[in-house]
Amino acid sequence: MINSKKSILAWSLYDWANSAFATTVMAGFFPVFFKEYWSTTDNVTLSTWYLGLGNSIASILVAALAPFIGAIADRGTAKKKLLIFFAFLGIIATGGLWIVNQGHWQMAILFYIIASIGFMSGNIFYDALLPAVATKEKYDHTSSLGYSLGYIGGGLLFLINVLMYLQPHSFGIPDGATAIRLSFLSVAAWWAIFSIPLILFVKEPKVHDSVSIFSSIKAGWSQLVSTLSKIREYKVVVTFLMAYWLYIDGVDTIIRMAVDYGSSIGFSASSLITALLLVQFVAFPATLVYSRFATKIGIKNALYTAIIGYTLITIFGAFVSKEWHFYVIAVFIACFQGGIQALSRSLYTRIIP
């Protein structure tokens, strides 16, 4: 039922579920582990390039497929089914990182690309289900609730994973490397378990009659061609998407590459992990507060403010030389990052035809 507490919470818990991947894998352990365990080169610049290439390949593939699979989902009323498919693609690939042995960077980056595709593609359909659980006046609050739960949920599991890494023997684990590999398994389990509420309690409204997958593909392709032919009629949407593609790619780059960047300039793993935990636990309340801020000055003005603030902080990040600088940046990043993500999702849901 739309606007029911149960459906809104069930939808929001998917953020809690998949943010474990964003935190423990994408932002936390994978960049460091890839550089120090899987990579076979002593050249830190080259390992950073491999990691950036993996992120770029995943992003390009998702960007290329998104309009087509989105159109198929619209015509076949299959957003939820496609969300589940891509979520479990990501879950299986994340769990697969457990089997990758030291030095096998090619297999590690392959699993990472597949998991990232599952994560990002799943989010396309997760975002598209927002109107199924909330009306327009509740978009900002519901979207912000999802991201805030994502930060606290991802942060909690990451904290457990960090403790496993720092004190492996306390958990019955032989060493830190095994602890990190087990962390990837824990992310897969966390992602799967906390996806269950959405699977059970979020009902996708039936917009079109159910059709076969082949009919959905045909109708989806026709819809995509039709939309592209009328692109000039959707100037607001196109303008927003172009801007969003640019600024959110910057946000995603910071999330994915910050730890690798800090490691490359000589910061200790413990300092980088501490900074990442700071982001998670500061962003949890900050995202909710930013939602209230948006109601005061308007969603677009709040989004402009967040983007400008985030940009200035990122510029300062280029001049970081001490570890305490990294902590300061982490706190300020946390103040704006969740707001950018949540309000962008809410605004896009409002303006799509």
Regions found by a protein language model. Give the residues of each.
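Helix-loop junctions at membrane interfaces in 12-TM secondary transporters
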Residues: 98-111, 318-330
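Intracellular juxtamembrane helix-capping segments at the cytosolic ends
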Residues: 121-135, 339-353
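Helix-loop boundary and gating motifs at the non-cytosolic
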Residues: 2-59, 106, 236-275
